Amino acid sequence: MNELQVKFNEKVKQDIMKNFGYKSPMQIPRIKKIVINMTAGNEVSNTKAVEEVINELTLITGQTPYKTHAKKSLASFKIREGMPMGGKVTLRRDKMWDFLQKLIDIVIPRIRDFRGISPKSFDGRGNFALGIEEEIIFPEIDFDKIRRNKGLDVIIVTSANTDSEAKYLLEKLGMPFAKATN
């Protein structure tokens, strides 16, 4: 079992149950899955760029991503319907906990000029989205092999009903949110 998963089971569950006044342990919000999405950006027409995205996502997550394709044709961006755009990975169970621990302990502290994660990135249903501008902050990515920074999206899907429950859960797991300024 991962350290973060042990922390969740031993400390965070009881803390959430006490703080929100849940009567049953089944009411406690949990992290269901983490979805990581990455696109080739301006280089979509270049098939090598899409393959680089797939390889980088495989290195970052330890799981083979599936290719995402364009839904519509856009002449201004030279994109045709069905053209490969990037990759997407859904992490669950142990790989999810391993990725979340790596994200909190290693990746987020390496973000340049980091002052905390904006707590405004919740969707109203207890899910959290985080945009990472540079994939080179992941320890698996070799800086010398990157032609261009692509960035990626990380979506943490929870079973929480409200944003406050999800934020409390992620804070207790160690997510460094920025303090609210007045």
Curated annotation (Swiss-Prot):
Keywords: Ribonucleoprotein, Ribosomal protein, RNA-binding, rRNA-binding, tRNA-binding. Transmembrane segments: none annotated. Part of the 50S ribosomal subunit; part of the 5S rRNA/L5/L18/L25 subcomplex. Contacts the 5S rRNA and the P site tRNA. Forms a bridge to the 30S subunit in the 70S ribosome. The gene is rplE. PANTHER family: 60S RIBOSOMAL PROTEIN L11-RELATED (PTHR11994). Belongs to the universal ribosomal protein uL5 family. This is Large ribosomal subunit protein uL5. GO terms for cellular component: ribonucleoprotein complex; ribosome.
